[in-house]
């Protein structure tokens, strides 16, 4: 069905002997154009995926992957999903165990807090900023994002503190940092890994 505006525009162009440009149809299965990102997934996609991961855990779809008893002294993680484009993890958080200041190399990331509360320290370019992420909160990590995540010590919950994380492309490396004098970061090491911090 053609709109009145489209018909009027076509008639106007024909009267001026202007040929409208030919539209090219792209097949639905045609590859997406390449972007500057290392993945076709965007941060918004990863946030949606982590939100779905939380729903799946709460619905019991991953019960077979969960420990029989929650370890309250050591962090653990379990992979919920993996393919060439995406890794999805369930991560536990215990008191006093920080991840260290790190990046995700060439991967984008996102998380949704399933239970409890996290405190994230992220590098702003000249200082560390802090944000608190409570159950249901989400955060995305663009390329170059440097942060340290820890269980929020000011919030006590009866069960474990858990979050679902997605990385695209899947993690292959992480660099670790320290804040140096004069307000800049110094890389301390880079490790090859296929597991989250």
Protein language model regions, located:
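A short hydrophobic beta-strand segment most commonly corresponding to one strand
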Residues: 110-112, 156-174
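Glycine- and acidic-residue-biased ligand/ion/polar-headgroup-sensing regions
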Residues: 95, 106-121
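N-terminal leader/capping segments at the start of a protein or of a new domain
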Residues: 1-61
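Intrinsically disordered, low-complexity, charge-dense segments enriched in Lys/Arg
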Residues: 145-152, 164, 173-178
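Conserved short histidine dyad/triad with adjacent acidic residue
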Residues: 89-104, 133, 142-144
